[in-house]
Amino acid sequence: MTFFKHKTSIIDKNCKIGKNTKIWHWTHISKNSIIGFNCNIGQNVFIGENVTIGNNVKIQNNVSIYEGVTIESNVFCGPSVVFTNVKYPVSTKKVLKKNYEKTLVQKGATLGANCTIICGNKIGKESIIGAGSVVTKKVNDFAVVIGNPAKQVGKIINGKKKNTI
């Protein structure tokens, strides 16, 4: 094994975990998921079936990533970030996996603590989602968004945030 797995974590069958990745306490990685190298998966994280996570990704504690989510390399997910995969869940109906909506988090994005990412959206590369934001639509590359619903308030230019409001 070329990665670290805490004894309380669970990794289901057919998962691929990259070299030097660390998986901490009470984390569950569901079947057929792929996690790249040099990742840090915090405590009490749930990763659903068929999720793909790139290299050098940091996922803080209490994050939920459901089937249909792809996270590219160099992404930061703050504590308690939640991804959804069904826009209108109903307890009395079974949702078929073919109806899951896909979410893509592109390279270098930062998701602040307690963000909720509604399914079917793309989070642009190098974008920043402020803590507590609820993302209900596409986030452009290099955008800074905050709020509920999240709205663009700035842009990253030459590595620095510039306000647009």
Residues covered by each model-derived region:
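Flexible, glycine/small-residue-enriched loop-and-beta-strand segment within the central core
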Residues: 1-7, 23-123, 149, 154-162
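Compact Cys/His-rich metal-coordination microdomains
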Residues: 140, 165
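Short glycine/serine/threonine-biased micro-segments
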Residues: 16, 40, 110, 118, ...
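Acidic, glycine-centered active-site loop in nucleotide-sugar glycosyltransferases
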Residues: 141, 148-149
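C-terminal/domain-terminus segments
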Residues: 123-138, 144
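Glycine/alanine-rich phosphate-binding loops at beta-alpha junctions
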Residues: 19
